[in-house]
């Protein structure tokens, strides 16, 4: 993740920017480990001098729950957004149906990612390559949100850019936005 990372995050950022409710899948206590783009690049440079073949897990440290990460961004931006928790089974089924009908940008990866834990042990890369992440999840998300907030008008008019450099189409999420 970096300052210009948008895609589906652009939808989240729009909700935060407008002070809307953030609909959470389940209790929001699940964790997902991000990696800051500059940290990933730094790790790749360090790996160039590594004279062995190995597999490394890479990611941020001190991974907090989605509740904590989102509240950090909300609190540090002055947003009026608040978290609303919905039953995991109900939300996941709804996301699957909407995806199958072609009316949602959220696919199988997203419904797994936002409802389960994805945190990996990064001890090996730290010990063998001397890698240390520089940003935590909440700091990365805040940087990305701030970029969105400062550039939202130009972002709306972008053409021919990658999916991660523009805001994803909301589809059925537009209806959810009305109730937010």
Regions picked out by a protein language model, each given a short descriptive name:
Residues 1-2, 24-30, 56-64, 74-77, ...:
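Glycine-rich Rossmann NAD(P)(H)-binding loop
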Residues 1-32, 37, 73:
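NAD(P)-dependent short-chain dehydrogenase/reductase
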Residues 6, 28, 33-41, 48, ...:
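Conserved loop-to-helix N-cap of the C-terminal "lid" that shapes the substrate pocket in Rossmann-like
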Residues 6-10, 67, 119:
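Short, surface-exposed alpha-helical segments at coil->helix boundaries
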Residues 15, 43-46:
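Conserved C-lobe helical segment of Hanks-type protein kinase catalytic domains
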Residues 47-106, 122, 142-143, 151-160, ...:
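Mid/C-terminal beta-alpha module of Rossmann-like enzyme folds, strongest
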Residues 109-122:
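Active-site loop of classical SDR/Rossmann-like NAD(P)-dependent oxidoreductases
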Residues 137-146:
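Short linear loop/turn motifs
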